[in-house]
């Protein structure tokens, strides 16, 4: 019964794609980062295929200089009344932030996600190419508005390890001088509470994070601006414990 249900949902997603219209977008970027006390650069190409309509298709391709184009993420979905269904490898619902060095990040590879209203539930597969009945983990999230804030509560349960990770995200707090948000996670088995606070103003984004055993571990930020049709971004992360500053910079062109 479970095999038939999952196979039927996937077939519906594929069939619905023929009724949609798509667009292709791309970005060429020059990225620079510090490693081993030296600054190195790479040229990257990102291509996106987005289809919307009765069905949705999202394909994200990337390549670097001298390497083949690879498919990084893909999602195929459809909407049936108030019910949204998506199948792909980009359906994780745990809250994220900017640095994310101290947040628990349960793996979610290929998965089947069902959304209705503000609720999303995703079933992750161990290896969908060999057995679509082998479920590795289950994630769920609920988003609501509270006093002008966007609040998300989420959880991940791993069926193999029987571990649970709880998560929460908050955004939309306008302080006038900046907008404030953040995320937090709690790993039940590890008994670790991680958090990150993010502030944004215009093209500037700053963050700090830590956990309940070490409150301040990383401080970082990035500034992004338009330069003659291109986007320039410069940022850095400072590891407080290692006393290590890691700068980054990029110049990207969208088409």
Task: Provide a role label for each language-model segment.
Residues 1-255:
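Outer-membrane beta-barrel proteins
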């Amino acid at each position: 019964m479970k095999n038939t249900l999952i196979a039927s949902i996937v077939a519906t997603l594929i069939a619905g794609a023929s009724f949609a219209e798509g667009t292709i977008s791309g970005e060429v970027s020059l990225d620079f980062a510090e490693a081993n006390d030296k600054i190195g650069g790479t040229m990257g190409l990102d291509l996106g295929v987005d289809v919307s309509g009765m069905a949705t298709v999202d394909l994200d391709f990337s390549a670097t200089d001298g390497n083949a184009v690879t498919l990084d993420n893909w999602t195929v979905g459809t909407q049936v009344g108030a019910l949204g269904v998506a199948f792909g490898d980009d359906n994780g619902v745990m809250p994220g932030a900017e640095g994310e060095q101290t947040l628990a990040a349960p793996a979610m590879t290929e998965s089947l996600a069902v959304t209705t209203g503000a609720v999303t539930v995703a079933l992750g597969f161990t290896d969908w190419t060999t057995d679509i009945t082998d479920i590795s983990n289950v994630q769920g999230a609920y988003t609501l508005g509270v006093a002008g804030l966007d609040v998300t509560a989420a959880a991940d349960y791993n069926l193999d390890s029987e571990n649970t990770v709880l998560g929460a995200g908050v955004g939309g707090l306008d302080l006038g001088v900046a907008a404030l948000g953040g995320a937090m996670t709690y790993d039940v088995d590890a008994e670790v509470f991680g958090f990150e606070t993010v502030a944004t103003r215009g093209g500037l984004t700053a963050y700090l994070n830590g956990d309940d055993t070490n409150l301040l571990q990383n401080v970082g930020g990035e500034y992004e601006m338009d330069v003659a049709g291109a986007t320039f971004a410069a940022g850095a992360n400072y590891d407080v414990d290692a006393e290590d500053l890691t700068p980054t910079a990029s110049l990207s062109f969208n088409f």
